[in-house]
């Protein structure tokens, strides 16, 4: 039975809600079939093993049921989703060579300025393909590899490593949309940081889904070898449409012994988006993974970055904020598997809901029998801005080890009238006062972001708060 397309109320996000059309773009047919999967693979001239993985993933996708634990995705009909849209250009390494319509999009989003100001490298994806990729000479001279993952897949030096790692942390059997990703993935980044290499400036990838009724399925694969250090930033946005769009990307992070990786994300999808993203890290002995996450936008969201701590004294920290407004049901959280002695994890999240938005936080801490002497703490704070909104906290703990210390605390509250009245007594309007309080609530996340992204997050909160009074 054919489902109706999702209708979503218009929301003013003028910085992101613009499009220059699709002149010269190539769209495959909507839906997902073996022929479509083969066509995607053929366009990319992939090795046979990748085509085999795609077709096997499609079989798994067709067998698996929709998830039952989170928000309804009944309005998402894959028969209406276009899984591949090629923009009107191949990948460029010179910004001036990018077509004007795409270049104007990223310039409005501030990507070139960010690259000039503080980034060691940047990749920009438009719909299904990377359109721009560049890395500073200082990073390349250090032996760091930062390229499109498809470019690396066709490089004899890196194809064996990609074959070894690709979709091993997130196998197609993990869940239905991991299988979908395995079948139709396109675009994304490959990063390799050699042993002992420490990059002082971040790398960034920005993903823009421009096409109406389409999906974006980029794959990010990052390998940080022993004693190396990297900060990677991911940004996402899309214009709004009155039909469903889908994002089902995947992120696989391999962190070596005594290595450190910070992965920062600001997701600002349009509110017709189904964001069903999967992110996972494996951390070896004395390694450290930091997740910094800001989730704004999307109609329905499932997002639970996961850390598997496989080496003694491996560490994971997660700091995240989710803002659910009108018409949004965002189910977010974090998972940690303590799978070696003396591992440790901290999870700190902030959730904000307004105008009937629903925000759910899920945490899962698993201590395997190998995790003796490990520790984990989970803290969740939620702020509801009106009587129509909802916030839930759903913790899960599975402890099979001795001598572990695992704790969880959660608080749900509202903005105190006394705080608002105090600020108003200083000449601040009620709306500005509430915005200031919400920004203060979000500060533990924003202070961990690069300045430009912290400003963007505060502006997003301000935009969401406009008209919140009355």
Protein language model regions, located:
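Short, low-to-moderate order helix/coil transition modules at the start of elongated helical scaffolds
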Residues: 2-250, 254, 260
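Short arginine-rich
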Residues: 62-71, 441-451
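Conserved beta-strand/loop scaffold segments within soluble protein domains that form the structured core
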Residues: 134, 141, 145-421, 425-428, ...
């Amino acid at each position: 039975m054919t489902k109706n397309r999702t209708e979503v109320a218009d929301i003013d996000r003028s910085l992101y809600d613009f499009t220059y059309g699709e002149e010269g773009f190539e769209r495959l047919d909507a839906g997902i079939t073996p022929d479509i999967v083969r066509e995607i693979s053929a366009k990319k001239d992939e090795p046979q093993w990748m085509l085999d993985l795609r077709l096997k993933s499609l079989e798994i996708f067709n067998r698996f049921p929709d998830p039952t634990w989170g928000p309804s995705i009944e309005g998402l009909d894959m028969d209406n989703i276009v899984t591949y849209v090629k923009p009107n250009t191949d990948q460029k390494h010179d910004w001036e060579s990018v077509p004007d319509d795409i270049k104007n999009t990223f310039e409005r989003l501030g990507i070139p300025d960010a690259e000039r100001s503080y980034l060691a490298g940047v990749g920009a994806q438009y719909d299904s393909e990377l359109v721009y990729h560049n890395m500073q000479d200082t990073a390349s001279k250090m032996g760091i590899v930062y390229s499109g993952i498809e470019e690396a897949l066709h490089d004899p030096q890196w194809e064996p490593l990609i074959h070894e790692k690709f979709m091993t942390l997130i196998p197609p059997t993990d869940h239905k949309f991991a299988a979908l990703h395995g079948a139709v993935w396109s675009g994304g980044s490959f990063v390799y940081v050699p042993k002992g290499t420490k990059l002082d400036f971040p790398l960034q990838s920005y993903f823009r889904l421009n096409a109406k009724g389409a999906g974006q399925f980029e794959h990010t694969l990052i390998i940080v070898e022993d004693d190396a250090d990297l900060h990677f930033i991911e940004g996402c946005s899309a214009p709004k449409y009155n039909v469903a769009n889908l994002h089902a990307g995947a992120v696989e992070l391999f962190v070596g012994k005594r290595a450190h990786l910070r992965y920062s994300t600001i997701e600002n999808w349009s509110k017709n988006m189904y964001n069903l993203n999967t992110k996972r890290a494996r951390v070896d002995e004395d390694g450290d993974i930091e997740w910094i996450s800001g989730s704004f936008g999307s109609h329905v969201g499932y997002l639970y970055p996961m850390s598997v701590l496989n080496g003694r004294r491996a560490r994971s920290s997660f700091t995240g904020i989710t803002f659910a407004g009108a018409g949004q049901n965002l189910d977010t959280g974090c998972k940690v598997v303590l799978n070696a002695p003396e591992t440790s994890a901290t999870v700190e999240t902030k959730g904000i809901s307004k105008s009937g938005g629903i925000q759910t936080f899920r945490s899962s801490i698993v201590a395997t029998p190998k995790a003796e002497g490990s520790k984990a703490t989970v803290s969740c704070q939620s702020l509801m801005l009106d009587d129509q909104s909802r916030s839930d906290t759903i913790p899960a703990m599975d402890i099979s080890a001795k001598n572990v210390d695992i704790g969880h605390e959660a608080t749900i509250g509202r903005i105190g009238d006394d705080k608002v009245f105090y600020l108003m007594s200083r000449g601040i309007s009620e709306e500005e006062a509430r915005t200031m309080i919400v920004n203060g609530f979000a500060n533990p996340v924003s202070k961990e972001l690069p300045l430009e992204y912290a400003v963007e997050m505060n502006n997003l909160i301000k935009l969401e708060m406009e008209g919140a009074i009355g």
